[in-house]
Amino acid sequence: FQKDPQVLIAHEDVKRFEDMKGKTIFIGAASHRTFWPWLKSKYGLTDAQVRPYTFNIQPFIGDKNSVMQGFLTSEPFSLQKAGVKTNVLMFSDYGYPAYNATISCMEKTVQEREKVVAAFVRASMEGWKSYLANPAPGNELIKKANQNMTDEQLAYSVGKLKELEMITGGDAKRDGIGTIREERLKASYDLMVESKVIDPAKVDFKSTFTTRIIRDIKVLP
């Protein structure tokens, strides 16, 4: 994803991240190592505000003084269906540098089976291109895997992916779906160092990524 779909969802009185000071904020455990340090540093939010997010919208609905994390393609739709008026703030609109849904692989695998890794990456990018052009076959498989998924939810999600060009926008227009840039990765790395999520003495930036494989694939939207 060139545009990270992660968001914070607030009740309609909240217009900015700064307005969330003093609110209860529901976030998942993994978020403490990703976007939460960035939000704390940039907007003055605190750990004292945090409560566990259980992927259930009811605690948010029941507490008008609360905020919850979500994906732009998911929770806002559920809240809309429940008749709850909200404001949705998307991190990528405010300078959060991270990509989303990256492909991770052991360094040894890349070194010893690069052709296999490249084929997997190409198939993944071609899959996204095919899905966005014609979501119907993919949606049938999604509904088989998740009996609670509806056509309406899927249509909403695909609509948001296309409207905001989350996968096909930005550098992907020129360099292909799934492209990554060293400068943007460095911004994410620096953020993690600043937040003490990683120790630069133990994790060398250059060892954390390669642009070689995706650069040669170039599946244009």
Question: Which residues does each PLM region occupy?
Answer:
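Immediate post-signal peptide segment of exported/extracytoplasmic ligand-binding proteins
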Residues: 12-23, 112, 199-201, 220
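Conserved C-terminal helix/tail region of periplasmic/extracytoplasmic solute-binding proteins
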Residues: 183-221
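Class I S-adenosyl-L-methionine
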Residues: 37-40, 80, 143, 193
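Helix N-cap/coil-helix junction residues
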Residues: 14, 45, 84, 148-149, ...
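Short, glycine-/small- and polar/acidic-enriched structural segments
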Residues: 1-70, 89
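Pocket-lining segment of extracytoplasmic ligand-binding domains
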Residues: 55-151
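Secondary-structure end/capping motifs
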Residues: 112-198
